[in-house]
Amino acid sequence: MYDNIIFDLYGTLIDIHTDEEDIAVWKHMCEFYAQHGVKYNPAGLRSRYKRQIRRAEQAMAKKRFKFPEIQILEVFEQLTLKKDQTPSDCAELTVAAAQEFRKASTGYIRLYDGVTDMLEQLKQAGKKLYVLSNAQRVFTFPEVQSLGIEGYFKDISLSSDFGAMKPDAAFYQQLLDRNHINPNRSIMVGNDAVCDVLAAKQVGLHTCYVHSNISPVDDADRDIKADIIMDEVNVPEMCRLILEDADR
């Protein structure tokens, strides 16, 4: 029986399309920065952003985790800082810039059909719900709030907070330890065969794999060994299968 259901977010509960390469995004960000006294051209801003990402990744590679995660706010901090400023001087603008970028680069974001009803049913059945997602808090938390699902979860664990991402077992373990979760009575639900199935099994979790429109392309060639396997996103069926499997 499953007492705890751990969900991935994007591609599992949330359907999203983003495009950070679109030059229109960078034109928009140049206009945003210009309003705050920071001047860029679109190509130059995009190049500097990528350069700061690489630097952050190189710095994190020296950390203890096998799959480290950067903190995107530190990237936007470097883009936002003016001469003679300290990070605290531009903290609010850094957050605003990051969130403006996320909105500008998002083509659409929505819940898959039936997600709210599923979460409600699982709660009514006495299940404890959690999130474990490779995501940046400055982007994701406002999205979770705007989609109206924040209140269903006992804990929302995001990779940017911990400094490591799935498939790192340490990222899983910190959620289990903090919430005193028994993996034998818990299931991980996600759309990535490596991050959400193989990695979850390493820490003793049961698994539900759902193939979605943003699952990794090479998942189609993998021999996926999950307790529940879904070939497409069908949230009512997902809910039924989880509850059915939980009661065995």
How would you label these PLM feature ranges?
Residues I53-F67, K103-D113, Q202, H206:
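Short amphipathic alpha-helical segments at helix boundaries and their inter-helical linkers
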Residues D8:
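Short, acidic, Ser/Thr-enriched surface-loop or helix-capping motifs
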Residues E20-Y33:
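Basic, amphipathic juxtamembrane/active-site segments
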Residues C30, P42-Q99:
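A metal-dependent, Asp-based hydrolase signature
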